[in-house]
Curated annotation (Swiss-Prot):
Name of the gene: alr
Cystine bridges: none
Alphabetized InterPro entries for the sequence: Ala_racemase (IPR000821), Ala_racemase/Decarboxylase_C (IPR009006), Ala_racemase_C (IPR011079), Ala_racemase_N (IPR001608), Ala_racemase_pyridoxalP-BS (IPR020622), PLP-binding_barrel (IPR029066)
GO molecular-function term, one example from the UniProt record: alanine racemase activity
UniProt KW Isomerase keyword: yes
Protein name from the UniProt record: Alanine racemase
EC number from the UniProt entry: 5.1.1.1
Active site: 46 (proton acceptor), 280 (proton acceptor)
Keywords, sorted A to Z: Isomerase, Pyridoxal phosphate
Domain of life: Bacteria
Record pathway: Amino-acid biosynthesis; D-alanine biosynthesis; D-alanine from L-alanine: step 1/1
List of residues binding substrate: 145, 328
Catalytic activity: L-alanine = D-alanine
């Protein structure tokens, strides 16, 4: 009978190690919650907590005081529920597909009702069960994605019976430009939200996403639902595609701590002569004798093909440029600047960490941090740690 991998064996066998700092996650939640109090602060944990593992991340937010958790799909909520205590509430942002209403009610999960059809379906179930059912009601205030349109809202107000069957816990909307403090769309959406609320019986409301929590008290209402800021990304800087600045100037503006590091293992080091081509298509040609190293991660692991011949890894303070095309399972680095013998089979290089932020990698990929974060695949060895005061405690 074979024995299961130990944690050390899993780490060694994987192409890379994704280290997630649960203490930093709790810090980020607490920092936002404290700053916007007495507004309640929820945590958005959709897409498996932005790829970091909802079953580990959501309990960390719970320990920091969070009791409200937003996911995108009902299946995500059902899967996460066993990892949270009974006083936690799960909300489904995308609402419900027809035929799933009974399961949602049975599990005690609250849907966000985004259309008149979803409202009608939820109210119909309430009628069959003979009781009001709790839900959130979303309005479209300018994003044109989810939420009741102005016409649907008018029709809803005309149907008193329909409204009477639903226990509306929050009226919500979503900011399209919350990460751009000077964008006039924010004020227009706030005005629309305020006008809609004035036409309803007094209800708790929610508007602010991560960026919205930095726009001022008028955006807070009764519940905020930050997402990307909890995961270490300053919402005002996530779209910064300018050249890298000095490392000391990269500190987040809003007391948000980075929550992850990513390292990859070297699987081969070789010397090549001038004129040697590297990778598929031979898109990189050595302009002289050089030393190259291949690492065991690729676009299947969230390091996109757009990093080909740009971007880098680090070993200590030394930048190691990516050369050639990114493959599915490997990336090649120029390591000529390191002394011979520094890197060998099994050595680790930094892809995300103190020398290179997640935002830097996203910029090199011509994308946003969300896309990189949620694409980090399940082939990494995942290590969850608590880092406090310079010390590290590792958890399985």
């Amino acid at each position: 009978m074979s024995l299961p991998f130990s944690q050390d064996e899993r780490d060694l066998a994987a192409g890379g190690i994704l280290t997630i700092d649960l203490a930093a996650l709790r810090h980020n939640y607490s920092a936002i919650a404290t700053r916007i109090a007495p507004t309640r602060t929820a945590a958005v944990v959709k897409a498996d907590a932005y790829g970091l593992g909802a079953s580990r991340v959501a309990p960390a937010f719970y320990e920091a005081g969070c009791r409200d958790f937003f996911v995108a799909h009902l299946g995500e909520a059902v899967a996460l529920k066993p990892f949270l205590k009974p006083d936690a509430t799960l909300y489904v942002l995308n609402g419900l597909q027809p035929g799933t209403e009974a399961a949602c009610a049975r599990e005690g999960i609250l849907p966000v009702l985004n259309s008149l059809e979803q409202v009608e379906n939820w109210a119909a179930l309430a009628t069959r069960l003979g009781k009001k059912l709790p839900a959130l009601l979303q309005f479209d205030t300018g994003m044109s994605r989810l939420g009741l349109s102005a016409k649907e809202f008018d029709r809803l107000l005309e149907n008193v019976t329909l409204l009477s069957r639903i226990d509306i816990k929050f009226a919500i909307s979503h900011l399209a430009n919350g990460d751009e403090p000077g964008n006039a769309v924010n004020a227009r959406q706030l005005a629309k939200m305020t006008a809609l609320l004035a036409r309803l019986p007094k209800l708790p409301a929610a508007l602010a996403n991560s960026g919205g929590t930095f726009l001022g008290k008028t955006y807070y209402f009764d519940l905020a639902r930050p997402g990307i800021a909890l995961y270490g990304i300053d919402p005002e800087r996530q779209h910064d595609f300018s050249d890298k600045v000095a490392h000391e100037n990269k500190k987040p503006k809003h007391s948000i701590l980075p929550v992850l590091t990513l390292s990859a293992r070297v699987i081969q080091v070789r010397d090549v002569d001038k004129g040697a081509t590297v990778g598929y298509g031979g898109t990189y040609v050595a302009n002289g004798p050089m030393r190259i190293a291949t690492i065991a991660v690729g676009y299947a692991d969230g390091l996109f093909r757009s990093l080909s011949n740009k971007g880098a890894a680090f070993f200590g303070d030394t930048r190691l440029p990516i050369i050639g095309r990114v493959s599915m399972d490997s990336i090649t680095l120029d390591v000529t600047s390191l002394p011979e013998g520094t890197l060998k089979l099994g050595s680790l290089v930094e892809l995300i960490g103190p020398h290179q932020r997640l935002e830097d990698v996203a910029r090199d990929c011509d994308t946003i941090p969300y896309e990189i974060l949620t694409a980090l695949g399940n082939r990494y060895a995942r290590v969850y740690v608590y880092v406090n005061g310079g010390g590290t405690s590792t958890t399985a």
